[in-house]
Every structure is written in C-alpha cells, then in structure tokens.
C-alpha cells in the first residue's frame, strides 16, 4: 500500500534511538512492574493534564472498567444503575459499563461532530442514572456548558473515555478548572494503545482524576484488590502497566504537542483540497479542540469509495462498521431505534492520518479522492 492508513514503524521512527536507550535503562534497572518509570509517568500525566492523580493500568478498557468499579466500591453506584453513553462509540465504552453490572443508556451523536449530542442528554436521565460517559471520538473534544448543567442539576458524575483525544483542549473549563481532556470531568479512562496519538509499544492505559479516594480504590483494584501486600480489600484484577511501556510513553509525551500540531496541519490540507461533492468533511472545532486521532469523512457510497481508494494505493479504515447496540453480544439492544449511529456506521471512512504524513502525500491522496466517480 503506497499510502497506508497508519504505519506504526514510521510513527515511532523519530523516537526509536531514544526509546532503545530508555529500554536498556529499564532492563538494567531490574524492576519491571510498578517501578519508578510508572511512578514518573503518572506524575507527568498529572502535570500535563492539570489533575491531581493518575493511576497507570494495563490497558484502556481496564481503565474504564476500574474507574466505574471504583465508584461501585465507594457506594456511588450499584449494579443496575444507568450510565448514559454515545450510541456510536467504540464497544469498549459499553463493555466497561456492562462488565460492572451497570446499564448503558444510548444517546445519539451529532451527525456533524460525531460526538454525543449534549442537547439530547437530559431527556435520557432517569431515577437510576448515575453518570454520563463522554467520548472524545476521533480526537475531538466533547464538552460544553449544557453537559455540565445537566450533570449538576441531577447530581451525575461525568466520566470521560479519553482514549482518542489525549492532548486536546476544551474551550469550556472542566469541573475542576482544567481545559484538557482527561481532566474535564470527575474521572477519565485513557488508552495508550500503539495507534493512539500518545501510543505505547504494547497495551497500556491510565485513570486520571482529582478524587483521591477514587484513585486509591482504582490502584488497589488493579493490583488484585490490594493496597497493602497480601491484604486484599476488594476482589480485584491484575491490570498494571509495566515499566517498559511507561518509559516509552515518557519519551513520546515530550513530543506529543508537536505531533498533534502536525496532525492538525495534515487535516487542514485534507479539508482545503478534498472537493468531492459526495464527500462530507469533518468539522474541525476551535483551536486545540480537535487533535485528529482520525480524519473521518462521510460518503453515502462509502464501501465503493473504500474499494476505489484501495485500488489506488490509499489505505483506509472504518471506525466503526457496527455500532455497539447492533453487536451480537448486545442482542438485547439490537432493535433500539438509533438511526444516526447506524447512518454513521454506514458512511464513515478514516483516511490516512499521522504526524509523519508529508504535504505532498496528503495532496496526492486528496487528488485521488477528488477523482472518485459516484
């Protein structure tokens, strides 16, 4: 493929020598789980986001699961309670809810931003609602005063799925004054899967929050339920980031803002040069509001467009072809009327996107798209 949707080798090439050096340091240090590199990364995440606590986890799904589980252990939620979640999110958001015995309440996204339509949230609130999960999909911030007002009025937690927007900045302050995704709500789950803007070289995640009790419970839950060795407060799990991944992430975090600026530049070239009348371009939002984890267009002939681009050497992906409520594992929700999520699943297509794409390649991809004949 001449223009792959993403090449992890090329993504990590600029940091390779520095990561090799730090890997050797970790190996020679002789301590690989919950060591000083994990502690350092947690401190760096707090400093970057402007939050008080960060707890490293084994992956992004575990971050979301442990965050919600901690609220249950704290008595804030109980099985059977409801969590509002966007209907077009990746299935991990919903798995985190149902794995804890909580009930997902699907709310449709905006067809324009792809994010949760916050104007629809209040009508989904019931006596059993305990939280709103906002997902900053594709790298665009999902946060506004409407969301904050609804949460305050009904006493709801706002939890963030910040798997795709690490580094994005909201134009509206969060609950504790930060403007960074991951520190807007009461707590957030982060993913450092290798394809993310800040990606490890394996699985890794984190929970970020200003709630000290929540952070303490999450840390114990991810360590077999133990805060003190051989003393188990909870029926926990093993979900701990290793020091090697933490060290890699510390290296890459130094370059994240510049990498995100490069992604913004790539998106700008796409938006200025794709002119196909049947191609709907994504909305960029305000400055810093979109860090372009994916550049997602819409097309009513999406599958034909995807095949055409593949024949021209342009790799694409679909994020996501089946919405959660249509998955076999959630067959009890298969008949829910969620037309916007289903339309997006039929139309969205992710173009090549990374910080290393050069302008000439992006221009050529745009020219290829413009030659597509409906």
Task: Map each language-model feature to its residues.
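PLP-dependent aminotransferase class I/II
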Residues: 9, 38-43, 48-54, 61, ...
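Conserved coil-to-alpha-helix start sites within the AMP-binding
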Residues: 88-94
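Phosphate-binding glycine-rich loop
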Residues: 31, 35-82, 95-100, 106-107
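Active-site phosphate-binding strand-loop segment of PLP-dependent enzymes
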Residues: 112-200, 206-208, 350
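Hydrophobic residues in well-ordered beta-strands that form the structural core
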Residues: 85, 106, 158-160, 209, ...
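N-terminal "arm"/small-domain region of PLP-dependent enzymes with the aminotransferase-like
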Residues: 1-31, 312, 352
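Short beta-strand->loop structural element characteristic of the AMP-binding/adenylate-forming
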Residues: 102-113, 317
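Helix C-cap/helix->beta junction micro-motif
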Residues: 100, 153-154, 312
């Amino acid at each position: 493929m001449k223009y792959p949707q993403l090449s992890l080798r090329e993504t990590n090439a600029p940091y390779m020598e520095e990561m090799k050096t730090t890997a050797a340091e970790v190996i020679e240090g002789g301590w690989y789980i919950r060591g000083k590199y994990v502690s350092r990364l947690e401190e760096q995440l707090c400093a970057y986001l402007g939050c008080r606590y960060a707890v490293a986890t084994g992956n992004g799904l575990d971050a979301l699961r442990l965050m919600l589980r901690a609220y249950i252990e704290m008595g804030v939620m109980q099985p059977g309670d409801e969590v509002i979640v966007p209907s077009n999110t990746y299935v991990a958001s919903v798995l985190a809810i149902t794995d804890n015995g909580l009930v997902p309440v699907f709310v449709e996204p905006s067809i324009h931003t792809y994010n949760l339509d916050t104007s629809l949230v209040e009508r989904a609130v019931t006596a059993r609602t305990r939280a709103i999960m906002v997902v900053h999909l594709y790298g665009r911030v999902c946060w506004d005063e409407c969301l904050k007002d609804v949460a305050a009025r009904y006493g709801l937690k706002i939890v963030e799925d910040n798997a795709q927007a690490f580094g994005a900045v909201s134009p509206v302050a969060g609950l504790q004054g930060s403007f960074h995704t991951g520190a807007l709500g009461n707590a957030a789950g982060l993913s450092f899967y290798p394809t993310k803007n800040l990606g490890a070289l394996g699985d890794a995640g984190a929970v970020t929050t200003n709630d000290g009790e929540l952070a303490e419970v999450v840390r114990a839950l991810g360590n077999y339920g133990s805060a003190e060795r051989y003393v188990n407060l909870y029926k926990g799990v093993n979900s701990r980031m290793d020091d090697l991944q933490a060290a890699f992430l510390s290296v890459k975090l130094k370059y994240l803002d510049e990498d995100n600026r490069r992604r913004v530049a790539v998106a700008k070239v796409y938006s200025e040069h794709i002119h196909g009348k049947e191609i709907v371009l994504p909305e960029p939002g305000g400055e810093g509001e979109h860090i372009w984890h994916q550049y997602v267009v819409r097309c009513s002939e999406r599958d034909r467009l995807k095949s055409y681009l593949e024949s021209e050497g342009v790799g694409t992906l679909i994020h996501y072809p089946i919405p959660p409520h249509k998955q076999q594992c959630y067959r009890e929700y298969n008949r829910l009327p969620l037309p916007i999520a289903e339309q997006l699943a039929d139309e969205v297509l992710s173009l090549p996107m990374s910080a290393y794409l050069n302008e000439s390649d992006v221009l050529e991809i745009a020219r290829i798209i413009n030659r597509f004949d409906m």
